Amino acid sequence: EGVEIISLPGHSFDMAGFRTKDDVVYLADCLSSRETLDKYRIGFIYDVGAYLQTLEMVKTMKAKVFVPSHAEPTEDITELAQYNIDTVMEIAEKIVEICQEPMCFEKILQKLFFAYELKMNFEQYVLVGSTLAP
């Protein structure tokens, strides 16, 4: 009692956040810190459309404090939510640019890693590859 469940689809399967009766909102993994986004650039997103809708919804939320899993607690989540949206849109534009000529999935992934100067390892291949896969 006193806890509101907030649906946060997109980043992973059926993710949820919680608002407590003292107006603290726990946002789970629905957004990342600027530092994380700047370092890794491309994270795992299960459903990009749903993820962007979730970020737009989060951007409009009001609470005493927001507690994301991958960022510092804050009283205003708007700027961080917008940064996450902007990062996703920038990457989407880069993917469209890369796909101007036909190529296989692995080549697209390679070009994306090269464009963002990322190091390919198994973990990154799985996370980023899962995000890019249709």
Sequence positions of predicted segments:
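Metallo-beta-lactamase
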Residues: 2-92
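C-terminal regulatory/interaction regions
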Residues: 94-134
